[in-house]
């Protein structure tokens, strides 16, 4: 009998287990693609036609995790660590561009913490109202299921970006981490 790695979604799980498992797989794959790099590698604009960096993606997805699980899900404003970072009202590109000012340790901690916070908030919402529970975005017309699909879409896009960037930085390729790699979140 083989034991699936912690990022592998269940083969025959419930809808919640499948959705959360798919999201955790993308989170783990993204984190592995960005793992273990220094400032120069995280800030490397490895694709000439793009300003994207792995550091920028780490910070952007950390912001997305907290924004989806507060502003979009509950309507609440994001608190720390964002409140003390000078997050602008229109933060569309801020995570991408401001990451150059952060150390690798800060970026990894920011991302890992945001994943933990988002997971806790989503699991609490699931316990209280399930996938059909309304969320704050668009006046409650969205449900949690749709919010999770949007988060999966965001991760799908940026995990693909991270795949190309990491290969350009040091040649790392592949879909999954080694089986002994443990996601730090």
What annotation goes with each model-predicted range?
Residues 2-9, 16-91, 133-185:
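Short, contiguous alpha-helical
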Residues 6-13, 17-20, 98-105, 109:
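Charge-dense, low-complexity intrinsically disordered segments
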């Amino acid at each position: 009998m083989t034991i699936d790695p912690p990022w592998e979604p269940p083969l025959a799980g419930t809808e919640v287990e499948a959705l959360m498992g798919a999201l955790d797989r993308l989170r783990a794959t993204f984190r592995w693609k960005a793992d273990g790099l220094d400032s120069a590698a995280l800030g490397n604009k490895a694709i000439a036609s793009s300003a994207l960096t792995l550091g920028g993606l780490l910070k952007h997805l950390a912001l997305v995790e907290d924004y989806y699980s507060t502003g979009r899900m509950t309507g609440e404003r994001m608190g720390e660590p964002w409140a003390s970072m000078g997050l602008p009202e229109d933060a569309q590109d801020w995570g991408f561009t401001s990451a150059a000012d952060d150390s690798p340790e800060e970026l990894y901690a920011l991302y890992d913490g945001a994943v933990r916070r988002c997971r806790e908030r989503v699991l609490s919402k699931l316990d209280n109202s399930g996938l059909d529970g309304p969320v704050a975005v668009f006046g409650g017309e969205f449900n949690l299921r749709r919010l999770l699909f949007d988060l999966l879409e965001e991760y799908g896009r940026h995990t693909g970006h991270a795949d190309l960037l990491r290969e350009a930085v040091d040649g790392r390729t592949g879909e999954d981490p080694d089986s002994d790699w443990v996601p730090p979140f």
